Amino acid sequence: MEPCRSLALFAGSLGLTSSLIALTTDFWIVATGPHFSAHSGLWPTSQETQVAGYIHVTQSFCILAVLWGLVSVSFLILSCIPALSAPGRGPLVSTVMAFSAALSILVAMAVYTSMRWSQTPFSQVQTFFSWSFYLGWVSFILFLFAGCLSLGAHCRTRRAEYETL
């Protein structure tokens, strides 16, 4: 297996794992006050609270990014097995899906970041982004790497020429 394909598979797997962890954990925001500390994520625990629209947008695009990342990694795995892959098409599909995952997670993170920054802070409470939030941005970078490396793997694959058919 060529190095671009194996590195793309590694970066895509890390991107998929980090986006799944970021999506499911509750440490996107941490709030500290004089006598308390609290954290929250994308999934509210109380049924009575009204969820803001930007949270729904972030949830939706994060889920899309996970799905695109899963398809990308699956096609990279299939491209490593010659009997299961179409000649030269696995890395190309993986490239498109990895870039789609990167775009989806970028939209999710940009919406969440812009809406959290525009909220007015309370005087006694300090809020800041936590590790789940930063893991979402890391998954964006990893999906970009996976897309670029998959594109490199696609460009380096040998295609059947007319004479060999």
Curated annotation (Swiss-Prot):
Disruption phenotype: Cytotoxic activity of natural killer cells and CD8(+) T-cells are defective in knockout mice. Mice fail to resolve Leishmania donovani infection, which is accompanied by a sustained reduction in the production of pro-inflammatory cytokines and a defective CD4(+) T-cell response. Mice infected with Plasmodium berghei ANKA show a significant reduction in the recruitment of parasite-specific cytotoxic CD8(+) T cells to the brain, along with lower levels of inflammation. The chain crosses the membrane at residues 9-29, 61-81, 92-112, 133-153. The keyword Transmembrane helix applies. It holds the Pfam family PMP22_Claudin. It comes from the Eukaryota. The keyword Membrane applies. InterPro entries: PMP-22/EMP/MP20-like, PMP22/EMP/MP20/Claudin, PMP22_EMP_MP20. Keywords: Cell membrane, Cytolysis, Inflammatory response, Lysosome, Membrane, Transmembrane, Transmembrane helix. It is found in: Cell membrane; Cytolytic granule membrane. GO terms for biological process: CD4-positive, alpha-beta T cell activation; defense response to protozoan; granzyme-mediated programmed cell death signaling pathway; inflammatory response; killing of cells of another organism; natural killer cell degranulation; natural killer cell mediated cytotoxicity; natural killer cell mediated cytotoxicity directed against tumor cell target. GO terms for cellular component: cytolytic granule; cytolytic granule membrane; plasma membrane. Induction: Up-regulated in CD4(+)T-cells in the liver and spleen upon infection with Leishmania donovani. Regulates cytotoxic granule exocytosis in effector lymphocytes, thus acting as a critical mediator of inflammation in a broad range of infectious and non-infectious diseases. Essential for cytotoxic degranulation of natural killer (NK) cells and CD8(+) T-cells and for the activation of CD4(+) T-cells following infection. Plays a critical role in CD8(+) T-cell and NK cell-mediated cytolysis of target cells and contributes to the cytolytic activity via the perforin/granzyme pathway by enhancing exocytosis of LAMP1-carrying lytic granules. This is Protein NKG7. The gene is Nkg7.
